């Protein structure tokens, strides 16, 4: 079973493309969705997060306050590193377990890992490069990313720009891409690209 690593900057349309690939039969493991799972009420990361940051990092329902954590992580590099040390190993463990289950079932034509920080983690012990056959980058202009995130999440422009600045550059993602979907235009231009890659991934 071919294994695809799908990535792109915030607001690039990763989730939308992953959903369309899933509709076409792909097994999809979304690391961002898993990140939400482990920081939900009773999630696997909650005890360690409280130990590291205190109970004030939780909402009233017991979930991690994502807005507060995001603001802290992007203003304090030490806090960001501490957060990643807690969450990244858990996310990776669960992702690989679900991916292995999909591969063992052989019920899908190919497997897609959705990894927002795939390019940032290409080097080192926890690189995704050795785990995927092809890297698929969802690409769009940076200004388009920023506008989409502001419209979707209602975040201040300065915070969105800070998030974008701390991610891999557009050029860095394109440099390692095996396949690229251009999501800078209309929806009508996006779907044929998804169909083309779906057929290509099935053929191997």
UniProtKB/Swiss-Prot annotation:
PROSITE patterns hit by this protein: DPCK
Domain of life: Bacteria
GO MF term set: ATP binding; dephospho-CoA kinase activity
Pathway: Cofactor biosynthesis; coenzyme A biosynthesis; CoA from (R)-pantothenate: step 5/5
Binding site for ATP: 11-16
Pfam families: CoaE
Record GO biological process: coenzyme A biosynthetic process
Keywords noted in UniProt: ATP-binding, Coenzyme A biosynthesis, Cytoplasm, Kinase, Nucleotide-binding, Transferase
Family: Belongs to the CoaE family.
Descriptive protein name: Dephospho-CoA kinase
Organism field: Ralstonia nicotianae (strain ATCC BAA-1114 / GMI1000) (Ralstonia solanacearum)
């Amino acid at each position: 079973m071919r294994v695809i690593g799908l990535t792109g900057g915030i607001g690039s349309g990763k989730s939308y493309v992953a959903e369309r690939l899933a509709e076409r039969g792909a097994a999809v493991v979304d690391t961002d969705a898993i990140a939400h799972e482990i920081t939900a009420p009773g999630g696997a990361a909650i005890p360690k997060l409280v130990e590291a940051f205190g109970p004030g990092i939780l909402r009233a329902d017991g979930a991690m306050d994502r807005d507060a954590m995001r603001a802290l992580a992007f203003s304090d590099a030490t806090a960001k590193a501490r957060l990643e040390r807690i969450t990244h190993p858990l996310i990776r463990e669960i992702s690989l377990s679900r991916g292995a289950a999909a591969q063992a079932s052989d019920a899908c034509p190919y497997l897609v890992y959705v990894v927002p920080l795939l390019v940032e983690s290409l080097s080192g012990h926890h690189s995704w490069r050795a785990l995927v056959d092809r890297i698929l980058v969802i690409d769009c202009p940076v200004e388009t990313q920023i506008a989409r995130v502001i419209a979707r999440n209602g975040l201040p422009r300065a915070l969105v720009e800070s998030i974008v600045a701390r991610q891999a550059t557009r050029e860095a993602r394109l440099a390692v891409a095996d396949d690229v979907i251009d999501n800078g235009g209309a929806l009508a231009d996006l779907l044929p690209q998804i169909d083309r890659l779906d057929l290509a991934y099935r053929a191997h």
